[in-house]
Design a protein with these regions (language model features):
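Short loop/turn segments at secondary-structure transitions that flank enzyme active sites
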Residues: 20, 49, 87-89
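Short acidic, gly/pro-rich beta-turn/loop elements at beta-sheet edges
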Residues: 22-24, 53, 91-93
Length: 214
């Protein structure tokens, strides 16, 4: 979480750390806040976009304008990104994880963390620019808006209005596992279905640890 003050109210920003599944418990927590608290506090789920955000990495200061971006639209109204920041290139050999963290933070601060979850399918980090014309990361909001997408400001609004549709080939064998005969539907958390179909339980296990799922 992050704490701040906007000149009028204190602000508590709860980060889902890039995971849609973590939005649900954070939104629930947000909605339990009493009115007496909300008189003095804004509680946000997801980092908010900040146009003038600057990230300090060691002796370097990095803004979204320092990051080159190549975007490819996916079939489900998302974008896959390739990012290259020459200021971070020397750090790639020493601490790759730190570079990924820095660029993830810049993406979140450019369009907001919830919008990043909703619209960014993923990104790769390149040490050298591609041989194609690049945009700047700071132009990502305009790119998404040109695709007809509206940025999400808060996790609660996103979850309330985002249903994902899916379609599968039904398994007609009467001895097949449960649910494999279901071929189309809508849901808000597709990772649960994916985990079930691949015999995984990562999301449910995380919920169990917090006493959410039974």
């Amino acid at each position: 979480f992050e704490l701040g003050f906007n000149g009028e109210k204190y602000e508590l920003i709860l980060s889902p750390e890039g995971l849609r599944s973590r939005l649900f418990p954070l939104v629930y927590f947000q909605q339990q806040a009493p009115e007496s608290v909300l008189e003095h506090w804004n509680i946000w789920v997801g980092r908010q976009p900040s146009k003038d955000f600057m990230l300090r990495a060691g002796d370097m200061e990095i803004r979204a304008e320092d990051v080159q971006m190549w975007a490819e639209e996916t079939e489900d109204q998302q974008v896959s990104l390739v990012l290259c920041c020459e200021k971070l290139t020397p750090l790639l050999k020493e601490d790759t994880d730190r570079v990924w963290w820095a660029l993830s933070m810049l993406v979140d601060q450019t369009i907001g963390e919830v919008s990043a979850i909703a619209f960014v399918a993923g990104f790769d980090v390149y040490a050298q620019p591609k041989d194609k014309p690049a945009m700047l990361l700071s132009q990502l909001p305009e790119l998404l808006q040109s695709m007809g997408l509206s940025l999400w400001r808060d996790g609660s609004d996103y979850l309330e209005n985002s249903y994902l549709a899916y379609e599968l080939e039904p398994v007609e064998d009467s001895e097949a596992d449960w649910r494999l005969d279901v071929y189309t539907g809508t849901c808000r958390l597709p990772v649960i279905i994916n985990d079930y179909l691949t015999a995984r339980s990562d999301a449910v296990d995380e919920y169990h640890k917090d006493g959410i799922a039974v």
